[in-house]
Amino acid sequence: MKMVVMVRTDINMGKGKIAAQVAHAAVSLVLDCMSRSSWRDWLDSWLHEGQPKVVVKVSSLEDLLSRVDKARSQGLPTTVISDAGRTQVEPGTVTCAGIGPGPDDLIDKITGDLKLL
């Protein structure tokens, strides 16, 4: 089990901003899994396995959303994070997206080709 957060590299964000956006994605995914019984077993397994998280780079909004669509079609938990626009990016800018927690093999089919951030 793992969670993967994909961060856009085509927008200018500092390290702190990226860290905050990744945290938003991780929290959002966990809350979604807690409220949906079909994902609860995956969440419980992930929690007991040390909560593995992987952060990867994606080069465009189109690529990010395409991968989110693939994950959704596989029944995986997903979240798309849009920034409030108070600091470094315009309001509503999609900064990152998360997939999981879910089975490694399902997530790897979608994100396995992406480079680590």
Curated annotation (Swiss-Prot):
Q: Does the keyword Transferase apply?
A: no
Q: What is its main location?
A: cytoplasm
Alphabetized SUPFAM superfamilies for the sequence: Peptidyl-tRNA hydrolase II (SSF102462)
Q: Where is this chain's protein located in or outside the cell? A: Cytoplasm
- Record-listed E.C. numbers: 3.1.1.29
Q: Which residues span the membrane?
A: none
The record's CDD domains line, in alphabetical order, gives:
PTH2
Give me any GO biological process, just one.
translation
Give any Gene Ontology cellular component: cytosol
MF annotations from Gene Ontology: peptidyl-tRNA hydrolase activity
Q: Which Pfam families match?
A: PTH2
Q: What's its catalytic activity?
A: an N-acyl-L-alpha-aminoacyl-tRNA + H2O = an N-acyl-L-amino acid + a tRNA + H(+)
**What EC class does the entry list?**
hydrolase
UniProt entry keywords in alphabetical sequence: Cytoplasm, Hydrolase
* Function of the molecule: The natural substrate for this enzyme may be peptidyl-tRNAs which drop off the ribosome during protein synthesis.
Instruction: Please give the family membership noted in the entry.
Output: Belongs to the PTH2 family.
Provide the protein name: Peptidyl-tRNA hydrolase
- Provide the organism lineage as a comma list: Archaea, Thermoproteota, Thermoprotei, Sulfolobales, Sulfolobaceae
